[in-house]
Amino acid sequence: MGNCWCRFEPLNHRVSANAKSESPKEQSPTVEDKHIKEVQKLPSNPKEVEDLRRDSAANPLIAFTYEELKNITSNFRQDRVLGGGGFGSVYKGFIKEDLGDQEVPEPLPVAVKVHDGDNSFQGHREWLAEVIFLGQLSHPNLVKLIGYCCEDNHRVLIYEYMARGSVENNLFSRVLLPLSWAIRMKIAFGAAKGLAFLHEAKKPVIYRDFKTSNILLDMDYNAKLSDFGLAKDGPVGDKSHVSTRIMGTYGYAAPEYIMTGHLTPGSDVYSFGVVLLELLTGRKSLDKSRPTREQNLIDWALPLLKEKKKVLNIVDPKMNCEYPVKAVQKAAMLAYHCLNRNPKARPLMRDIVDSLEPLQATEEEALLVPPVQKAVITIIDEMPKNGLKKVEELKKVEEVKKVIEDAC
């Protein structure tokens, strides 16, 4: 969706390097039997998929034919490709006809995610998970699934189009303008609300693959969670966790999940802490291009998050000191608590939402000219149109330096 689909990782890249292998020899007959039953239970033809979706869906999803998708994407033209990965490709398309009861007065842009002939159990399960979860759940901070296609060997998902793409592309881009502090906190707030909604749903859901490439942005930088292929039903009743295959993305996955396969809402909280730290520093969770001791963001930054003065040294320099210092310190402490190695000591997502709310800028504040830029504009306006003498120019330069120092 938008530029959002530019970095989808193949399934084998999602598994942590420290994950325990799951060879058949290590699996007990009970687990194998359960696996076989799961395969047998999974709906595989269009009617079974539609029946299952209709029985559990809160959102009216549309079952598209493959021929309709060819029309929507101009026959999957190459210049419509938005991105791709291990699952296949994503195309930009336009729906020109009414969608059931919904009128389409003008072409509606959509993102069409085509699974590349992966009809394995895992590939079909991830595709189906998105249909089920996004069919059941509706929230402003979850990407909207419009429909799907389950025809012959084709497995396709149709989403709302997210104009600004992924947080990953915006945060780490060398071409796009740097994200302001206000926008970064808006993104964190929106993503936190999405996770909190999942954790507090009637049937709790653990997202399991929270990372910057899975957070999408609309034109107003509203954040929405996408890609529910690895999402899992959360623990219910007196259960503290669910046991599952170790999947996710290295650098974001919680350490206890990597070690044991025990998945809890706290696993998502840890991943949120990683993303919040990326927003603070402008650095990737893992970056082999940096000096050895700085390649792992958590190892490098975690000891500094509690230090009110030192933490300012790791803030993204692309923001040019244009941020409220106290808010940065509060966000850093929040990230520190999310990254606690003890999952029981991490905050709940609802508490994280409450902590981020006071850090949100008003619409008016977000539109204000940053103090350094404002000072420079003022100085330039005061300059005589016929120019300045050299000594006066130097004086103005010193004034600008002083303003920058004060702002930082």
From Swiss-Prot:
Single biological process term from Gene Ontology: defense response
List lipidated residues, N-myristoyl glycine. Answer: 2
Catalytic activities: L-seryl-[protein] + ATP = O-phospho-L-seryl-[protein] + ADP + H(+); L-threonyl-[protein] + ATP = O-phospho-L-threonyl-[protein] + ADP + H(+)
Q: Which residues carry this modification: Phosphothreonine?
A: 65, 244, 249
Gene Ontology molecular function, alphabetical: ATP binding; protein serine kinase activity; protein serine/threonine kinase activity
Q: Which ranges are annotated Polar residues under compositional bias?
A: 18-30
**Disulfide bridge map:** none
Question: Residue positions of S-palmitoyl cysteine lipidation?
Answer: 4
Name recorded for this polypeptide: Probable serine/threonine-protein kinase PBL16
* Gene that produces this protein: PBL16
